[in-house]
Amino acid sequence: MFASLLLAALPLLTHAALTYRGADISSLLLLEDEGYSYKNLNGQTQALETILADAGINSIRQRVWVNPSDGSYDLDYNLELAKRVKAAGMSLYLDLHLSDTWADPSDQTTPSGWSTTDLGTLKWQLYNYTLEVCNTFAENDIDIEIISIGNEIRAGLLWPLGETSSYSNIGALLHSGAWGVKDSNLATTPKIMIHLDDGWSWDQQNYFYETVLATGELLSTDFDYFGVSYYPFYSASATLASLKTSLANLQSTYDKPVVVVETNWPVSCPNPAYAFPSDLSSIPFSVAGQQEFLEKLAAVVEATTDGLGVYYWEPAWIGNAGLGSSCADNLMVDYTTDEVYESIETLGEL
């Protein structure tokens, strides 16, 4: 009888939990300074990190800027947020932008005071910066699970020296940044990640890694994880099928785990700038759609050898619901009530 009951229950066990079920909540302290707070699914006001941890989310991504003009996302800001993440029992993923402001495929501006003319000087500055960041967290007894050397660097990093006109320079910079992490005082060395945009495009992913590794400046042993962004609203070509192929090829070609480190799905998108991918076109723009998208995305990651996790980008950024896209609202929070959506729990159960 027990055996038959057990067998009957087995179909409900659709997949094992991903290693990383994460969210980027970098904006939290700024939002709290503006007076915002959050409510759980029972309508009770709680700290956002508590709501996320209670939902099963186990890792938090934080962006780090070098010398921001107003202190936003600098090292002190991130220490304050990381202490709360640690207290909530979640792991920490630091996303080093290596800039004083946003770094992405269209802008990789070198921090103020760092060299833009001498590669040797810039390598040394980058090494000392990643070393300092890690040692500061070590001094505060905060472990770092993952650290990425740059953010969406398919077009290079630390421009102009790290532009794609010289993949040798890109490789040398990544090597220096990685070794600042490896030489730090952290008791456990973080997993070092390289993060590119357009994770669905195997051609773009492979071109970057094949080219930069061929220079001999970046060694395969310098880093541990591939990180990719996957946003379905920026290209009709960003199908789940393409992502599945890209992740599988990345892992099999270079023998490293893969993580989807940025993604979104809208609850409202009346005027998308681009057609949505064909194999996602049936998913509604709603909370239920967020849930369905996350489950399908998780299935792709889980089906990939060494596919480790999914991070949702800025699910609670009230006041910026479009999150830079042409969609009206990609949040997992109802910004009219400050209450989280059920999709938060879906993310925590992936």
Curated annotation (Swiss-Prot):
Name of the molecule in the record: Arabinogalactan endo-beta-1,4-galactanase
Activity dependence on pH, as recorded: Optimum pH is 4.0-4.5.
EC assignment: 3.2.1.89
Record keywords: Glycoprotein, Glycosidase, Hydrolase, Signal
Source organism, top-level taxon: Eukaryota
PANTHER family named in the record: ARABINOGALACTAN ENDO-BETA-1,4-GALACTANASE A (PTHR34983:SF1)
The species this protein was found in: Aspergillus aculeatus
Disulfide bonds: none
Post-translational modification: Glycosylated.
Thermal response of activity: Optimum temperature is 40-65 degrees Celsius.
Family: Belongs to the glycosyl hydrolase 53 family.
Leading EC class: hydrolase
MF terms in GO: arabinogalactan endo-1,4-beta-galactosidase activity; glucosidase activity
Reaction(s) the record says it catalyses: The enzyme specifically hydrolyzes (1->4)-beta-D-galactosidic linkages in type I arabinogalactans
Endpoints of the signal sequence: 1-16
One example of a Gene Ontology biological process annotation: pectin catabolic process
Active site, renumbered: E152, E262
Glycosylation sites: N128
